[in-house]
């Protein structure tokens, strides 16, 4: 966090990555159409990453804030761990992690896998 604070203090660009599942991606609900399977409703402009970007830009007016959204619908923490390098290669100054919704449907072994993967992330 010291490096991030230094960048903000020195008015250097900051990169924040959001890493998670459909909640991170911007999925807010599932729609049911007659005779069709559930259909996710995405509103990426309302995703929490966008809301936090607005807050950062308001609070840190003289610093450019670059947001990377690495949310993928259906991802579990284990799936996220498998693709973490894709996000880290951009060298974000901060990473906000949000997995768990898809992991919550697992049995006890799946919950242990979630915990292990999240610790590695």
Model segments located where?
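Alpha-helical cap/lid subdomain in secreted, periplasmic
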Residues: 6-12, 43-68, 72-121
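N-terminal post-signal-peptidase region of extra-cytosolic proteins
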Residues: 1-3
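Catalytic nucleophile-elbow at a beta strand-turn-alpha helix junction centered on a G-D-S/GDSL motif
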Residues: 13-39
